[in-house]
Design a protein with these regions (language model features):
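Catalytic alpha-helical scaffold of carbohydrate-active enzymes acting on polysaccharides/glycoconjugates
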Residues: 1-202, 216-238, 246-332
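Short, glycine-/Ser/Thr-/acidic-enriched flexible segments
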Residues: 243
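C-terminal active-site rim and adjoining tail of enzyme catalytic domains
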Residues: 210
Length: 332
């Protein structure tokens, strides 16, 4: 377990953001980072160190460290106290050689990465797909939902073309796994960060609060949730994509700005993921995750994932209905 003592500086809760770099460009994320800096918040930004030579249908709009303007922007973020983290070598699956090239590029610019998050369906993802979890019922359900063979993700499989588990174990300290629709992660994973002997190539795992895009982020950090996070002395690491709608026409969306300003006025500890997990780790009395906690986490993650998928379908139907109404109206 992790001690619930107050945080450094007398803060009574901890909050940060882990920004997955999908779709990120200088244009669509710079304003939100300037806002975070002005509020005294320092967060974590993941990057892709090298370009994707084969192109990417889903993520091709995102920039990498091979883009000079983006590279300069990210280097400047690091100088300003933001943490730069690894999101794989690039936006599509990478064999070991490209992953090594990406890690070397990252290390040359920022030093070895301390924090990593798997990306989408990249085959070099570590302990991904059904290997994220152990519960046999949930593994069977997730297998059916994904439609991937069990050995699709091979970053942790020695001898695979996608193998890089040894590199992770030697360089990276923290890797993200399960995410939840919960602002206070102490409610679902009080033993974070934790080690898992069944997944030995990751030194420490951590959980996150899920906010896929700007609308989910606004819902997650509502004023009511902020008040609860503060009252409970909670920990929040938001897994999100700051390139997905946070900035419009060069400005941070009004509701995002208002909520972040209100959050910054509270007695929070606003540091990047790595330093936050370092502080939580030294409070651990052991490295392991209690079996009961892990069992509850898996089922809560599965429930939250299903509810998010249903909510996405409802929003899509609502948008389609609105489009149909406009189409009918224009024909009258």
């Amino acid at each position: 377990m992790t001690s619930p003592a107050a945080f450094p500086g007398g803060a009574c809760f901890a909050f940060t953001i882990m920004d997955d770099t999908d779709n990120a460009t200088v244009e669509n994320v710079q304003p939100i980072y300037r806002l975070l800096e002005s509020l005294g918040m320092r967060t974590t930004k993941t990057v892709w160190p090298v370009r994707c030579e084969e192109g990417s249908e889903m993520f091709g709009a995102g920039e990498t460290l091979d883009d000079p303007g983006y590279r300069d922007f990210v280097v400047d973020l690091g100088r300003r106290g933001f943490e730069i983290a690894f999101h794989g070598a690039t936006m599509e699956s990478s064999h070991r050689e490209r992953t090594m090239r990406g890690l070397n590029r990252f290390t040359e610019m920022f030093g070895p990465p301390r924090v990593h998050a798997n990306h989408s369906f990249n085959r070099e993802n570590l302990y991904w797909g059904v290997d994220r979890i152990d519960d046999p019922i949930l593994r069977a359900a997730y297998r059916a939902a994904l439609g991937h063979p069990d050995d699709f993700y091979q970053g942790h499989v020695p001898g695979s073309a996608f193998w890089w588990g040894d590199l992770c174990a030697g360089q990276i300290k923290y890797v993200r796994n399960l995410t939840f629709d919960e602002i206070n992660l102490r409610r679902v994973n009080p033993s974070m960060p934790y080690s898992d002997d069944r997944r030995p190539y990751v030194p420490w795992w951590f959980s996150a609060s899920d906010a896929e895009n700007v609308d989910a982020f606004v819902e997650l950090i509502s004023v009511g949730n902020q008040s609860r996070l503060e009252a409970e002395g909670g920990v929040c690491i938001v897994a999100t994509h700051l390139g997905k709608g946070f900035c419009v026409n060069g400005a941070v969306r009004d509701d995002v700005r208002e909520l972040l300003v209100r959050l910054a006025e509270r007695r929070g500890w606003f540091v990047p993921v790595g330093p936050m997990l370092d502080e939580l780790r030294v409070r651990r009395t052991d490295r392991a995750l209690p079996p009961g906690e892990w069992r509850r986490m898996q089922w809560r993650w599965a429930r939250d994932l299903m509810l998010r998928r249903l909510a996405t379908l409802r929003r899509a139907r609502k948008r389609k209905g609105a489009q149909n109404q406009r189409r009918v109206g224009s024909q009258m």
